[in-house]
């Protein structure tokens, strides 16, 4: 499968990995490693951590230079729309990365290949591997093709960082303490679910669920915004 991925990347993106082991690591889930304990395999978790940071930096610099008139708050909202699970999972699907993930049998049968959280992770880990193998210029070339054109296509026109919007909405009339609390953590290691609530001055104003705490917080903030806007109608 990794050899097929190398051929695909070479043909579609003109990307040639000098160290294929990095690519294999980036597309391997823990469940696959657990089912092949004697092969000395690595899975994507550490390399995903790096890819997430690289993507945030490159996207931040790009929108900072492209939109010199945008204030910090709007830059933050735009970046949050571009650098998030929903966007990254769509990019991964568009790049057909879902076809090359190495999964354990149980995860395969559970439909993990279509799971947005996993697709997001794989996109980030691929970026981490590309950065380690070929450096920042190669990553920039890739995202210039895959991510940045979506700005002109209107992908992010109506996307909003709900946490930032909630903060602006609540604090326009004064300082209000906004806090996010992890209420429940369930699911499995490969398919976790987090439940979070958001409070304003100690009162619960919204709840959310997601495959990460960050995503659950976004959902909680969005529910709080919807509730308050409905009250003001």
UniProtKB/Swiss-Prot annotation:
Active-site residues, Swiss-Prot/TrEMBL: 52, 124
Domain RNase III: 6-135
Coiled-coil positions: none
Designated name of the protein: Ribonuclease 3
Quaternary structure, from the entry: Homodimer.
PROSITE patterns: DS_RBD (PS50137), RNASE_3_2 (PS50142)
NCBIfam families xref list: RNaseIII
GO molecular function term, any single one: metal ion binding
InterPro entries from the UniProt entry: dsRBD_dom, RNase_III, RNase_III_dom, RNase_III_sf
Top-level taxon of the source organism: Bacteria
Keyword Transmembrane: no
DRBM domain residues: 161-230
EC number assigned by the record: 3.1.26.3
Gene for this chain: rnc
């Amino acid at each position: 499968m990794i050899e097929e991925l190398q051929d695909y990347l070479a043909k579609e993106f003109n990307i040639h990995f000098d160290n294929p082991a990095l690519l294999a690591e980036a597309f391997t889930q823990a469940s696959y490693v657990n089912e092949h304990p004697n092969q000395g395999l690595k899975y994507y978790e550490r390399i995903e951590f790096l890819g997430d940071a690289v993507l945030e930096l490159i996207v931040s610099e790009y929108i900072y230079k492209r939109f010199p008139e945008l204030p910090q708050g709007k830059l933050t909202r735009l970046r949050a729309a571009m650098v998030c699970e929903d966007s990254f999972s769509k990019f991964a699907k568009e790049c057909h990365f879902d076809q090359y993930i190495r999964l354990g049998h149980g995860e395969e049968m559970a439909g993990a290949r279509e799971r947005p959280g996993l697709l997001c992770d794989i996109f980030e880990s691929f970026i981490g591997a590309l950065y380690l193998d070929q450096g920042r210029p190669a990553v920039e070339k890739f995202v210039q093709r895959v991510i940045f054109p979506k700005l002109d296509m209107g992908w992010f026109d109506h996307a909003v960082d709900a946490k930032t919007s909630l903060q602006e909405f609540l604090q326009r009339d004064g300082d209000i303490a906004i806090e996010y609390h992890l209420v429940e953590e369930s699911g499995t290691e490969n398919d976790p679910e987090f439940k979070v609530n958001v409070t304003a001055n100690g009162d619960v104003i919204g709840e959310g669920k997601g495959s990460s705490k960050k995503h659950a917080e976004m959902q909680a903030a969005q529910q709080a915004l919807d509730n308050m806007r409905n009250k003001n109608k």
